[in-house]
Amino acid sequence: GKLQWPVSGKIISKFGTQINSELNTTTENIGIEIECPKHTTAMTIMDGYISKITFIAGMGNVIIINHGDDYKTIYSNIDGSIIENSDGTKTIFSTIDPSIKVSENQYISNNYKVGTISNNLTNNSGILHFQIWYKDKNLNPESWLIQK
């Protein structure tokens, strides 16, 4: 991979099928989960347009960025408040650093502050759930990011 990481941290849940032998369960992870210090700022890995800002149960606040050529990245578990603008678009403000805010249809450059990561209540760290899509296929983000 050649792309910068969206946050500095370590992958705690890999892409694809995860087998838990203790619980005898199998789960499918459509992205990766990166553990980072709480309140870490997430950065864009490519330039593009914010196509959607929404809340999804189990994923928290979600920001979807369209990078053109049918590529999208999805940042989940983003801290902040979502407001609806008079034109119907949404804006998300970080409650940790209010200077960090993005809006739907906004063009953002590579390495742009897109949000802060919500605190994970169990261990005082943050977890970013990060996905890369091409058309309707989810890709393994780890293979796109610079190897650590």
Regions found by a protein language model. Give the residues of each.
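A structural signal for short beta-strand/turn segments enriched in small hydrophobics and glycine
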Residues: I11, A42, G48-I50, S86-T89, ...
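Nucleotide-binding motor/catalytic cores of P-loop/tubulin-like NTPases across gene-expression machines
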Residues: N61, Y71-K72
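Flexible, gly/ser-rich surface segments that form the specificity/activation loops bordering the active-site cleft
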Residues: S51-A57, N110-I127
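Beta-strand/loop nucleic-acid-binding surfaces
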Residues: I74-I82
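Extracytoplasmic/periplasmic cell wall- or extracellular glycan-interacting regions that localize
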Residues: G1-K52, A57-M59, I64-N66, S94, ...
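A secondary-structure micro-motif
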Residues: E84, G88, I96, I117-N120, ...
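Active-site-proximal beta-strand/loop segments in catalytic clefts of secreted hydrolases
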Residues: K14-F15, H67, N77-I78, I117
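Short, surface-exposed ligand- or partner-binding patches at beta-edge/loop junctions that are enriched
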Residues: F130
